[in-house]
Design a protein with these regions (language model features):
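Extended, polar beta-sheet/loop recognition surfaces of beta-rich domains
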Residues: 494-531
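Bacterial N-terminal signal peptides
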Residues: 9-22
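Exposed aromatic-hydrophobic patches
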Residues: 473-477
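Short, surface-exposed alpha-helix to beta-strand junction/turn motifs within ectodomains of secreted
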Residues: 418-462, 487-495, 504-507
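Beta-propeller domains with acidic blade repeats across secreted/periplasmic ectodomains
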Residues: 27-403, 407-415, 426, 470, ...
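Surface-exposed, short loops/turns at beta-strand junctions within beta-sandwich domains
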Residues: 478-483
C-alpha cells in the first residue's frame, strides 16, 4: 500500500476543548447564561415539527460522532468528519427507520471542520484541518484513505481559537477557507491571515480575499456567485451577522489588519486607521471607506448565540417554500435561522427569521442532499449547547405541509412588503395594530458583544393588502438606514383556518432605502422625533468626550415635541420660541 503523509504538525492528535465565543457569559454586554441557553417552548417545537420533521440518527456507543462536516454522496451515502479527527462513510441515513452502518475512511486529522468532493479531474476529498488544507484519496480501493496530500499550509500559533473552516468550492475551481482569529494573547493575529477569507488554487497557492472576520464558522457561495459568511458575537462583533464578502473587504474585526500590509493583500486599511468606535458600524463606515457592515444582523439570543453553517436551499421546492433562501445554523442554541436577501442600490440587505429549533445538540455543519432534506452535524464539547445529547447527526425533512409564515420581507421607500406562504386573513391584515415595528442597532467596539442600542418605534401609518392576500405593504415613519428593524405581525391570521404565523417576527437590516413610489407622502402631517440619541463616538484622537449622562438627568424624556405645518407650509413655532 502506497502512502503519502501531510506535513501536519505532531500536535494534530491533541484533543482541544474550545469555544466559538469563550467566556461570553462573563462579559458585561452579554445576557446571562440562562438567557443565552433558554429552551424553546414545547408548543413551538411541536408546531415546527409538523412541517419540518427532525429524524435523529442513532450512533453506535463506541463512536464519538462530534460531526463537523457532512458530504452527501451518490447512492444515499454520507461522508462525515468529526472534531476528533476521524472521517466516516455512513450508510442507512436515508431510510424511513434509519439504522446506520459506519466505515472509517481516515483518522488522525487535526480537528477538520468541513469536507467536499474534489472536482474532476482531481480525485478524492478536501478537508480543512487547523494547519493545512488536505486532499484525501483511496487509491487502492480498500475503503481507507492512503493519500494525505498537503495542498496548502495554514499558519497557526497554537492558540486554541485558531479554527479553519471549509473548504468551499468556488465557481472557478479554486477552494476557499475562513480562518479564526486567536484569542487571549497579546495579539489575536500572531501569524499571517488570521481573521481572513483565503482563496487556494489547486496547486496550493494561497491568496487573501477579505479581512475583519472573527469566528466565521459558516460561509457559502450562492447560486448567483455571491459569497456570504456568518460570524460569532464577540469583541468588535456586536451580535451574530451574515456579511457579503468581496475581494478587498474589511468587515469589522481589526486583528487581521496586522497582515494587510503583506504582499498580495487586497485590503487597504491598516491597524492605525481604526480610531473610531463606540458607534453603530454603519456610521463609522460612512467616515471610514473600506469598512463593510453586515448584509443581515442575527440578533443575539433571538436567532442564536454562536452562528455557524450557512447553506442555500437549492432543492427547487423539495424542502418547502423557501427555495433560494439561506439557512444559518447555530451551535449554542441548537437551532436554524432563515435569511432572505435582496440587493438595493448595489448593497445586499435582507431579513432574518426563526425557522427550526429543538435539535438534540449544537449545530456546527449543514448539508443538503439531492432529495432536498438537510443533515445537521452536532457537537457541544467545550462550547455548551441546548439539547439532551453531546454530539450526533440528524436529518431534517419537509413533511409536505406549508405553514403560514412570512416568506420574505422586502424594503420600500417608506416601509416594507411582507410576503406570505399562504393567503392572509384580510380583516386582521388591514389593521395597523396587527403590526409593531421598531428599529435598533449594535455598537462597534472592542468590548465583547453589544446590547441592542438606540431602539425606537416605527409607527405603522398605512397598510395595503394585496388582492390575492399573499402580501401586505406597510408604510412606516421613523425608519433608519443602517438599522435592524424588528417587524412583528402577531395579530395576523391565515385566510384558511385562522392560524397565527408560525414565526411572527422578522428582523430586516435596512442598509439602503430603495427608490420607488411611496404610499404615504414624504411631508407627513406629523413628524415624530423618534431617533434615539446616539452616544458620543470614542476616538483615539479625542481629548474630551463625555461617557456618562449628567447626574441630574432623569430617565424620562423632558418633553416630546411634535412639529406640524400650518396653512402655507409654515411651522407652528409656539413650542420652539419660548
Amino acid at each position: 500500500m502506497k502512502r503519502f503523509f501531510s506535513t501536519l504538525p505532531t500536535i494534530a492528535a491533541c484533543s482541544v476543548v474550545t469555544a466559538f465565543a469563550p467566556l461570553a457569559f462573563a462579559q458585561p454586554n452579554n445576557p446571562s447564561s440562562a438567557e443565552r441557553f433558554a429552551k424553546p417552548s414545547d408548543e413551538l417545537v411541536a408546531r415546527e415539527n409538523k412541517y419540518w420533521k427532525r429524524i435523529p440518527l442513532e450512533v453506535p456507543a463506541d463512536i464519538v460522532l462530534e460531526t463537523s462536516g457532512i458530504l452527501p454522496l451518490p447512492g444515499q451515502r454520507l461522508l462525515v468528519t468529526t472534531r476528533r479527527g476521524e472521517v466516516y462513510f455512513i450508510d442507512g441515513a436515508f431510510a424511513a427507520e434509519p439504522k446506520l452502518t459506519f466505515s472509517l475512511f481516515a483518522s488522525g486529522l487535526h480537528e477538520p471542520l468541513g469536507i467536499i468532493a474534489a472536482p474532476a479531474p482531481r480525485k478524492g476529498y478536501y478537508v480543512a484541518q487547523r494547519a493545512e488544507l488536505t486532499r484525501l484519496e483511496d487509491t487502492d480501493g480498500d475503503g481507507r484513505a492512503d493519500v494525505f496530500e498537503t495542498v496548502a499550509k495554514i499558519p497557526i500559533s497554537g492558540s486554541y481559537h485558531e479554527y479553519a473552516f471549509g473548504p468551499v468550492l468556488a465557481p472557478n475551481g479554486h477552494l476557499r477557507v475562513t480562518l479564526n482569529v486567536a484569542f487571549g494573547g497579546a495579539t489575536q493575529a500572531p501569524v499571517p491571515w488570521r481573521g481572513w477569507m483565503m482563496d487556494i488554487r489547486p496547486d496550493g497557492q494561497m491568496t487573501p480575499i477579505a479581512a475583519g472576520l472573527r469566528s466565521p464558522a459558516g460561509f457559502a457561495v450562492t447560486s448567483g456567485g455571491d459569497w456570504f459568511a456568518s460570524d460569532n458575537q464577540g469583541e468588535w462583533v456586536g451580535s451574530g451577522k451574515l456579511t457579503h464578502l468581496e475581494r478587498g473587504d474589511f468587515i469589522g474585526h481589526p486583528a487581521g489588519l496586522a497582515w494587510s500590509k503583506n504582499a498580495g493583500s487586497p485590503v487597504s486599511l491598516r491597524p492605525d486607521d481604526i480610531t473610531s468606535f463606540g458607534q453603530p458600524m454603519t456610521d463609522v463606515a460612512k467616515r471610514l471607506p473600506g469598512v463593510k457592515p453586515p448584509a443581515v444582523w442575527l440578533p443575539h439570543t433571538v436567532l442564536g448565540i454562536s452562528n455557524s453553517a450557512v447553506r442555500e436551499d437549492l432543492s427547487g421546492g423539495k424542502f418547502g417554500p423557501f427555495a433560494g433562501q439561506l439557512f444559518v445554523a447555530d451551535q449554542g442554541q441548537s437551532k436554524i435561522a432563515r435569511v432572505s436577501l435582496e440587493k438595493v442600490k448595489g448593497v445586499w440587505q435582507g431579513a432574518a427569521y426563526a425557522f427550526r429549533s429543538g435539535f438534540d445538540c449544537g449545530i456546527i455543519s449543514l448539508a443538503q442532499s439531492e432529495d432536498g432534506s438537510f443533515f445537521t452535524g452536532e457537537t457541544e464539547r467545550g462550547w455548551g449547547a441546548l439539547g439532551p445529547k453531546k454530539h450526533g447527526i440528524e436529518r431534517l425533512v419537509w413533511t409536505g405541509e406549508t405553514p403560514f409564515e412570512i416568506k420574505e420581507v422586502t424594503a420600500q421607500p417608506d416601509g416594507f412588503v411582507l410576503t406570505f406562504t399562504t393567503p392572509v386573513d384580510r380583516a386582521t391584515a388591514e389593521k395597523p395594530e396587527s403590526y409593531s415595528v421598531s428599529g435598533f442597532t449594535y455598537l462597534w467596539h472592542k468590548e465583547y458583544g453589544s446590547a441592542p442600542s438606540n431602539r425606537a418605534g416605527c409607527p405603522v401609518r398605512k397598510v395595503v393588502v394585496a388582492p390575492d392576500g399573499l402580501s401586505v405593504r406597510l408604510a412606516n415613519i421613523c425608519l433608519r438606514e443602517g438599522y435592524i428593524h424588528e417587524i412583528k405581525a402577531a395579530g395576523l391570521r391565515s385566510a384558511q383556518g385562522k392560524e397565527p404565523l408560525l414565526h411572527p417576527i422578522a428582523y430586516y437590516t435596512l442598509n439602503r432605502f430603495p427608490d420607488g413610489n411611496r404610499i404615504i407622502p414624504l411631508e407627513v402631517k406629523e413628524v415624530e422625533l423618534c431617533v434615539a440619541p446616539i452616544p458620543a463616538m470614542a476616538s483615539a484622537h479625542t481629548k474630551k468626550h463625555p461617557t456618562k449622562a449628567p447626574a441630574d438627568w432623569g430617565d424620562d424624556d423632558d418633553k416630546t415635541i411634535v412639529l406640524g405645518t400650518q396653512p402655507g407650509l409654515k411651522f407652528d413655532q409656539a413650542l420652539l420660541t419660548k
